[in-house]
A protein has these predicted regions:
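Short glycine/serine/threonine-biased micro-segments
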Residues: 8, 13, 90, 119, ...
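Conserved strand-loop elements at the edges of beta-sheets that form or border functional pockets
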Residues: 25, 37, 137
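Gly/Ser/Thr-rich helix-start
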Residues: 11, 93, 115, 122, ...
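Conserved small-residue-rich beta-alpha loop and adjacent elements
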Residues: 122-143
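Residue-level signature of catalytic and energy-coupling elements of molecular machines
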Residues: 10, 29, 65, 109, ...
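Glycine-rich loop-to-alpha-helix module at the N-terminal edge of alpha/beta enzyme cores
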Residues: 32-119, 130
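Short capping/connector residues at structural and topological boundaries
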Residues: 12-13, 17-18, 100, 124, ...
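Hydrophobic face of amphipathic alpha-helices that form TPR/SEL1-like repeat modules
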Residues: 1-27, 34
Length: 143
């Protein structure tokens, strides 16, 4: 039986809990894998690592971030058939519907590739009667 472990800090890790959950194919009802369940310490560790990654990412210049997103886009396109098959197995969708879901997700990544020019913030005068609009880039952090 396939075991799905945790993916934290760019690595597959088993976690400290020995508890597992069953993963079913929703179209067939058959069990297709088991997933390792996280303990509270596994969760806290993952959140701390995500906070550190956020700090590193937030100081990275927008052009470097765009390069990462373009590489992500390239990987999605290169592996689209395999990813579509995973969506079929995980969500019970027919292939064409799963392909559409992947395409919609890819569109979000494509939008993110072009977003660096929007990160600058802006000021617009008189967007309404005696109303000016000002925006600034302010990362939210780990949510």
């Amino acid at each position: 039986m396939k075991i799905i472990e945790h993916f934290v800090d760019g690595k597959i890790v088993p976690g400290s809990s020995k508890k597992k959950g069953k993963v079913f194919n929703p179209a067939t009802g058959e069990q297709q894998a088991e997933v390792m369940l996280a303990s509270s310490s596994d969760l806290n560790n993952a959140v701390e690592i995500a906070k550190k990654a956020f700090n590193d990412w937030s100081i990275r210049p927008p052009l470097q971030r765009a390069r990462v997103m373009f590489k992500f886009k390239e990987l999605i396109e290169k592996n689209s058939d395999e990813l579509t098959k995973m969506i079929v197995a995980e969500h019970g969708k027919v292939y064409e519907d799963a392909k559409g879901s992947l395409t919609r997700g890819l569109e979000v990544v494509e939008f993110a590739c072009g977003i660096p020019h929007l990160l600058k913030g802006e000021f617009s005068e008189n967007v309404g009667t005696n109303v000016d609009s000002w925006s600034m880039r302010q990362p939210l952090g780990v949510v």
